[in-house]
Amino acid sequence: MINKMKDIQTLGQLEKSGYVSKSIKDELRDNLRAKIKSGKPVFEGVHGFENTVIPELERAILSRHNINLLGLRGQAKTRLARKMIELLDEYIPIVAGSEINDDPFNPISRFAIDLIAEKGEATPIQWIHRSERFAEKLATPDVTVADLIGDVDPIKAANLKLSYADDRVIHFGMIPRANRCIFVINELPDLQARIQVALFNILQEGDIQIRGFKVRMPLDMQFVFTANPEDYTNRGSIVTPLKDRIGSQILTHYPETLAIARTITHQEAKLNSVQTEAVYVPSIAKDLLEQISFEARESEFIDAKSGVSARMSITAFENLISTAERRALLNGSDHTSVRLSDFMGIIPAITGKVELVYEGEQEGAAVVAQHLIGDAIRTFFPAYFPKIEKLERDADASPYAKILEWFFAETGFELLDDATDDTYQKQLDAIQPLEDLIQKYQPEFPVKDKYFLKELILWGLVEYNKLSKDRIAVGYQFKDLYSSYINKL
């Protein structure tokens, strides 16, 4: 069918074929209706919005609304807008040579109207794919009306020997050139107020005015805007009359569960087959990584209004894999597993993606990142082992008493960053109470994940102030808390 349509090369052939042109909003609506009826996923690859954002977006499309996606950074706003391309017809005809994708049955540009008047049914047409019907502009303070809508082109006027009174001297901007397309303006509040005002009539009436030319152009467009909440973007805001002309404003959000967050990270992380084959990641490590982002969104050191992007988990996961991969390369090994101490390798991925409040600035970004990792461990620990109370009446009755006794008897225990897997495992196996604790409380835990769990016990005891942990040049040293205190006196 598509090949047959593409064989149609003139207006006359198009008329005889029975082709019926539709507005872009009707295209989106009709194709969405068909997808919903067939039970096919509409916004495939976007996770966590199935019961919240996506139903609202579908309602907006069915209502033929222009849309504003409002949410913090890293909430898949632009991804959703790009996914709307899949709801367009695969190919549509335009008048060949038209700058603004003129519909052969409803031409709006001077060029297309004159060409059809001259050639009639012989007017050439061409077919454009839906992938070409998406235009995107990042709103920046330097964007001008000429960029978006158009301006008089003096070079064109000189070449064609036309006066400035002739509308053929107009050079169309991005919006007219995106006629019959989805047009996305990202970070709308960053657009200067006077530029936002220029969008009023385009959204409502279809009128555009360029340097005194009142050009009546009923542009056929689907506008999608993305914006951060105004209280975060101190750079600007959306002017009220423009808000009034946007049909639906849809609020996005971060993943609500670890499972959804894991799915997003796994989908978006850029790993090659060498990395995935060389590095094994325990399931608990994946959950712990996602928990760090959840902790960051609640942290007193981080500005909640700015949000913590899903990109933080994605880049942190890539760094985590690379930390383990580097160790394997140094040791001449073809395979290794992620360790809890490898999580220190994700600190660079965290520090650049969180906006600190005053208290966080005082602590420093790297220290805050370490706090977040510690908070995630503290949150996870009680899910696997008995909760550690601040005050325990009988220390001997504690499930962790044997572990603490082991450390009290030892001068120190070191886990080196680049130790081989054999060395790492032998070191942890030397602490027999760790094995006993796992056998008692997690007897069915996967064997290949057991060493990560052993290390989690040590880090958990540190977070609950039962052991001390110090960074040494090439790794971490764990000690009995009281002996560490006495040594510092």
How should each PLM-predicted stretch be described?
Residues 305, 325-489:
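C-terminal engagement/docking regions of AAA+ P-loop ATPases
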Residues 80, 84:
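Hydrophobic positions on the alpha1 helix immediately C-terminal to the Walker A/P-loop
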Residues 77:
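Conserved lysine of the Walker
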Residues 63-67, 294-302, 314-335, 349, ...:
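AAA+ ATPase "lid" subdomain C-terminal helix
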Residues 3, 17-31, 159, 233-237, ...:
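Conserved C-terminal "switch" segment of AAA+ ATPases
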Residues 2-43, 142-145:
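Charged, amphipathic alpha-helical linker segments immediately N-terminal to NTP-binding catalytic cores
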Residues 88-126, 131-171, 179-276, 322-331:
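Canonical AAA+ ATPase core
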Residues 26-73, 153, 167, 289:
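Pre-Walker A (pre-P-loop) alpha-helix and adjacent loop at the N terminus of AAA/AAA+ ATPase modules
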